Amino acid sequence: MERVRDLASEKAAVIFTKSSCCMCHSIKTLFYELGASPAIHELDKDPQGPDMERALFRVFGSNPAVPAVFVGGRYVGSAKDVISFHVDGSLKQMLKASNAIWL
């Protein structure tokens, strides 16, 4: 979990994904459309990916474990959570507050 914590804090917005995950692609696209440039960690392309995926599942309980979204170093949630935050307008506010976007 330490590696996940370190990576989750490296930028204002961080998304743990898998390259074959359609919801991961959707969340990445949403962030790009909002003007954010998140750090993307493809767990299926990282040698430590399986360990990080297990840690994400164990700590946050999301199944599947990806996408796992962090804003300002804080776990925001999975795709369902992020979409809910986007719909109610709070995702953009989180991104602004963490300096992931400026407008």
UniProtKB/Swiss-Prot annotation:
Q: Name one GO cellular component term.
A: cytoplasm
Superkingdom, natural source = Eukaryota
Domain Glutaredoxin intervals: 1-102
Task: Name one process (GO BP) from the record.
Answer: negative regulation of transcription by RNA polymerase II
Q: Which UniProt keywords apply?
A: Cytoplasm, Disulfide bond, Electron transport, Redox-active center, Transport
Keyword Transferase assigned: no
**What are the disulphide bonds in this sequence?**
C21-C24
A Pfam family (short name) is Glutaredoxin
Biological role stated in the UniProt entry: Has a glutathione-disulfide oxidoreductase activity in the presence of NADPH and glutathione reductase. Reduces low molecular weight disulfides and proteins.
This protein is called: Putative glutaredoxin-C12
Which source organism? Arabidopsis thaliana
